[in-house]
């Protein structure tokens, strides 16, 4: 900011005449006053400030869409009604690529005979589907 603009005024844009006295108006001198008012109390209670740990780069981490086998088991009849799955030889054939789902996880119970096509299966999901008489087809 150009100080010339404020020449002729008593306080040069600093508010009242009291405001620019001492270092109290800017939280101390130098690097003092970098923290807020209750910082010491927070430190005594053990709160941690600053950066801690490791954050995975965004390029490395991927956000995939998932579904659990329990949800597939419940939704199989509705998917057939909607035309998103079909029943062949007493088994529900579900192609998850068409639904935009990339991975099947193993939470829940499987009671129906499911033939599921997906890019990835967790070990527990594959085991549960095959124990119920179904099969897992890896899409490429």
Curated annotation (Swiss-Prot):
Residues 24-33 have a biased composition (Gly residues). This is Large ribosomal subunit protein uL15. GO terms for cellular component: cytosolic large ribosomal subunit. GO terms for biological process: translation. Residues 1-33 are annotated as: Disordered. PANTHER family: 60S RIBOSOMAL PROTEIN L27A (PTHR11721), LARGE RIBOSOMAL SUBUNIT PROTEIN UL15 (PTHR11721:SF3). Binds to the 23S rRNA. Part of the 50S ribosomal subunit. One of its GO terms (molecular function) is rRNA binding.
């Amino acid at each position: 900011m150009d100080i010339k603009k404020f020449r002729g005024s008593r306080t040069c844009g600093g508010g009242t005449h009291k405001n620019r006295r001492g270092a109290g108006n800017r939280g101390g001198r130098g690097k003092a006053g970098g923290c807020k008012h209750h910082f010491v109390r927070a430190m005594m209670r053990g709160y941690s400030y600053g950066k801690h740990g490791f954050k995975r780069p965004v390029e490395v981490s991927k956000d995939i869409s998932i579904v659990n086998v329990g949800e597939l088991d419940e939704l199989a009849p509705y998917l057939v009604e909607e035309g998103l799955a079909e029943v062949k030889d007493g088994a529900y054939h579900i192609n998850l690529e068409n639904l935009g789902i990339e991975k099947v996880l193993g939470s829940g119970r499987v009671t129906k005979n499911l033939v599921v096509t997906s890019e990835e299966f967790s070990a527990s999901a594959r085991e549960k589907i095959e124990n119920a008489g179904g099969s897992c087809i890896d899409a490429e």
